[in-house]
Amino acid sequence: MARKVKIPNHIQKRLARDAHKRKRNTKSKRKYFLIVCEGEKTEPNYFESLKNDLPKGVLTSCRIDVEGTGRNTLSLVEESIKMKERLENETSLSIDKIWVVFDRDSFEPDNFNEAINLCKNSLPEIGCAWTNEAFELWYLLHFHFYNTAINREMYQKLIEGNLKPKVGEDYEYQKNSKEMYDLLKENGSLELAIRFATKLEAEFEGRFDFANHNPSTKVHHLVAELFGLEELLKKEDEDKASG
């Protein structure tokens, strides 16, 4: 069953501004979103499951492609730009928004920061759902607030610690599992994850040394945008009817 997710006000306002920009000089058409992930399975599996959980009608009005590349940081952003051009040529459709999803992991700070700045400076801007240090931080925020830097192995142990009491003591975290979105939906809280990610973001407000924002994630902006599409589409329909 499709779900409703409460979107924080500051994200709703940003989405409304973006929708207003897109509306100008734009004919009515099916919107096209491209999500390009660093991982070939972990992140694509999560977002494919999330996509199927969006409110009824969103996928009728929006095409959402999720691609896993095996690339990282700067090379991922560069590949997403090439992928957009290639898909637009192949489909004769215009992609409205690109999002890239990648982790800090052990990559060079300069490459990580440069990738984020390239997204910000692109025209149109590329959405950047980065996480420092690993995507699994987003999973953990469905249960508790974490603001201490930890390694990937500890993420795995904490995920298992949060899920074992709910699904059974024999549970073992599988990095590329197709069930992760559903496990989090049934046993955690997406609204809590968005709230905690926003709280982490505020701890680094005004700082642009992104490689040192540990722990932190921007995944909630992408998730909120996807779940906010239903209201934005309704608003655009109302604007067309009144205009």
Give short role names for the model-derived ranges.
Residues M1-Y32, T42-P44, E48-E67, E85-W99, ...:
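C-terminal accessory helical subdomains adjacent to catalytic cores in phosphodiester-
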Residues L34-E38:
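Short hydrophobic beta-strand that contains or immediately precedes a catalytic carboxylate
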